[in-house]
A protein has these predicted regions:
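Aromatic- and carboxylate-enriched substrate-binding clefts and catalytic-loop regions
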Residues: 1-8, 12-15, 22, 216-445, ...
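Catalytic and substrate-binding clefts that recognize carbohydrates or anionic sugar/phosphate headgroups
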Residues: 1-185, 189-193, 207-212, 549-570
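Short alpha-helical segments and helix-capping/turn motifs at coil-helix boundaries
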Residues: 32-41, 46-51, 110-117, 202-208, ...
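Aromatic- and glycine-enriched glycan-recognition loops and surfaces
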Residues: 43-47, 104-105, 145-286
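Residue-level detector of short, conserved catalytic/binding motifs and their immediate flanks
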Residues: 49-53, 58-60, 91, 218, ...
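Alpha-helical packing segments of well-folded alpha/beta enzyme cores
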Residues: 110, 199-206, 262, 301, ...
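Catalytic core of carbohydrate-active enzymes
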Residues: 336, 356-362, 381, 387-395, ...
Length: 633
């Protein structure tokens, strides 16, 4: 139809549909239409990382083989017809069929058939499930100010000046750095102040802040942000006409050495490092980029990986462009370079398409925090993305912009039972660090970060399963399938793996000034099941809806199913081994197993070293270094 191709299929009254990629605020599509288009829209109703794949509870799935925009009408126009349209004249599609009788079997079969065509999801390294900190430590200048709204580790208030000056550090302001060391190569244009008093503005100081406040931290991106560049050597210097690359290359090497120094310090404290990517991956390509305006924006990604030791990469619209095939090629290039080190890559990106799951975890984009809407719309977004072929998804803790102590704490509670969680610092109305606040929020933030660290055996086993099985974050119909759980009635709760039911606090129902509240409309499935309040031990019969569930500020509504076996570690702040400099690292020889006895149950714990990857780029074959399964009864 006028350069459009339309697939029309009959639908049944009791048929439900899922997929379509990252459809913000939505997970179930019956009676609605969704856009399969990269809208780069990060809020409710928008689309980021679309995917031309959907599946039905009737046991079929469809993947359109296209990079053209589309619209999928799941009975909005006609309740008896599913009409999926793409803006191209050629119709090309893969059809998947499941003969399983239950919806869990259908979901697993159809997702695996989708993976057969597009590739299995990447398995994240262990550290990627811990909190990440991202900011730009090459770009900004600071001054102490009573009118500032940023409190740093010394307890004083500052205001930032670099962004307002076009990402040039103003003269005589306190300069941010990675290691509290100013540039030494081609540094004539660098006018910021670096001395013994400026350590508080360094990336190292943030690692120290987590250590001093006993807060878990797994990875760190010290250059996340537009205008940040990849160092301060060669600050706003460029090659003169006819000049060779000798001076340029010495600047790149100096910046890589500075990054290597930070990586060494970070790893000594149990923290892995990574980089944000704005432009190209080599110095030659960087100089050709339209955004290039100085040697500080040059990079050599191979050296950053193999000399400086970075293992993580975050990209956004500055690099993946309009998305579609460009996004796939971008994350593939980054993944392959990271994988060349033998370490398992962490790639966080957006604006993806079918196949994105091979190389990247979905990041939902830039949003404003400090409001309940931020948590609310993310819950169904995570559920929906997990049903759409990429089980790895994450977002910023309390957004990149704005900020609120209460929302930060409630968001951390929610994200404890998700995959990746990012402190996106440097852009909001306050510092995005879990310890830059007051009690009770500091203690609660610590409690949940430590709980996630302890639950890593359970989380990591679920991550292994998600590579070729059901996702970690599961819609409630995968626990109990009926019209109620297929609908939006359960869109604000989910199963995390087989055993945890998570019902985040996502609105002010009847909160006091601190944030103590209640949670309504919690559905506990299974009339023969018993659900146990994880924090109090109180038991609830399944097959009911709970209202006025007590949710004081410290408490996430969290239930564990009777009969569950939960493997855990002892308290730790990162997954690296305990050393003299990493006293709160992980001792994997010391375990905790929580039993909730009911009948005969068992648990298969899956482990590997959490970091290794042997990768054949030509065949896309991945070996995660061997794994061990422990059967617990």
């Amino acid at each position: 139809i006028s350069n459009k191709t339309v697939q029309s299929l009959d639908t049944k009254a009791d048929e439900y549909f899922f997929g379509g990629g990252t459809q913000n605020g939505r997970f179930t599509h019956k009676g609605k239409s969704i856009n399969i288009a990269n809208e780069s829209s990060w809020t409710d109703g928008g689309v980021s990382s679309p995917n031309p794949f959907y599946w039905s509870t009737e046991g079929y799935g469809v993947l359109r083989n296209t990079f053209k925009d589309g619209k999928y009408d799941f009975g909005e126009t006609s309740a008896e017809v599913v009409a999926t349209t793409h803006n191209e004249s050629e119709f090309d599609a893969y059809y998947f069929v499941s003969n399983d009788e239950d919806v869990n079997g259908k979901a697993e079969t159809l997702l695996n058939e989708y993976y057969t065509v597009t590739g299995n999801p990447m398995l994240l390294p262990e550290y990627a499930f811990y909190l990440a900190h991202l900011n730009c430590y090459n770009r900004d200048g600071w001054e102490e100010s009573t009118s500032g709204n940023w409190v740093l580790e010394d307890g004083k208030t500052y205001r930032e000046l670099g962004q307002a000056s076009g990402y040039v550090i103003p003269e005589n302001t306190y300069a941010e750095t990675l290691n509290n060391e100013g540039p030494s190569v081609d540094a004539d244009n660098f006018k910021g102040t670096v001395n013994e008093d400026t350590y508080k503005f360094s990336a190292r100081a943030v690692i120290d802040g987590h250590v001093d406040n006993d807060m878990p931290l797994g990875w760190f991106l010290p250059n996340d942000g537009y205008g940040c560049g990849y160092g301060q050597n060669g600050y706003y210097q460029t090659r003169t006409s006819g000049e060779d690359t000798t001076r340029r290359d010495s600047v790149v090497d100096a910046n890589v050495a500075n990054l290597a120094s930070f990586t060494e310090y970070a790893e000594a404290n149990g923290v892995r490092s990574g980089l944000w990517t704005q432009a190209a991956l080599t110095p030659d390509a960087s100089e050709q980029d339209s955004r290039y305006n100085g040697f500080q924006n040059l990079r050599d990604f191979n050296k950053e990986v193999n000399v400086a030791g970075v293992s993580a990469l975050k990209t956004d619209v500055a690099w993946v462009g309009y998305g579609y095939s460009m996004a796939l090629n971008s994350v593939k290039d980054g993944y392959n370079i990271l994988a060349s080190s033998g370490k398992r890559p962490t790639v966080v990106s957006l604006d993806g398409w079918a196949g994105f799951q091979r190389y990247a975890s979905v990041w939902t984009g830039d949003q404003t925090g400090g409001n309940w809407e931020y948590i609310r719309f993310h819950i169904p977004t995570y559920i929906g993305q997990s049903l759409a072929g990429n089980p790895n998804i994450g977002s910023d803790v309390d957004g990149i912009f704005g900020g609120s102590d209460l929302i930060t704490t409630r968001d951390l509670q929610f994200k404890t039972f998700t995959q990746t969680m990012l402190d996106m610092d440097g852009w909001g109305s306050k510092a995005k660090k879990p310890y830059i606040t007051t009690d009770p929020y500091i203690s609660i933030n610590r409690m949940y970060l430590k709980l996630k660290a302890q639950l890593m055996p359970y989380i990591y086993t679920a991550a292994h399963e998600a590579v070729d099985g059901l996702p970690m974050i599961r819609a409630m119909f995968l626990e109990e399938a009926n019209d109620y759980t297929y609908s939006t009635a359960t869109q604000y709760q989910y199963m995390f793996g087989d055993n945890f039911l998570v019902a985040p606090v996502y609105q002010d129902t009847n909160a006091d000034e601190v944030g103590n509240d209640v949670r309504n409309n919690i559905y506990l499935p299974g009339t023969s099941d018993t659900w146990i309040d994880y924090f109090t031990g109180e038991q609830y019969r399944g097959g009911q809806i709970i209202n006025n569930f007590d949710a004081p500020i410290w408490k996430l509504p969290l239930f564990v199913k009777n009969g569950s076996i939960i493997p855990m570690y002892e308290e730790n702040n990162n997954p690296m081994a305990i050393t003299e400099t990493n006293e709160k690292g992980l001792d994997k020889t010391r375990r905790i197993v929580e039993f909730y006895p009911y009948g005969e149950t068992s648990y298969d714990l899956v482990e590997d070293d959490g970091i290794t990857l042997n990768y054949d780029e030509a065949t896309n074959e991945r070996d995660y270094g061997g794994e061990v399964t422990t059967h617990i009864t």
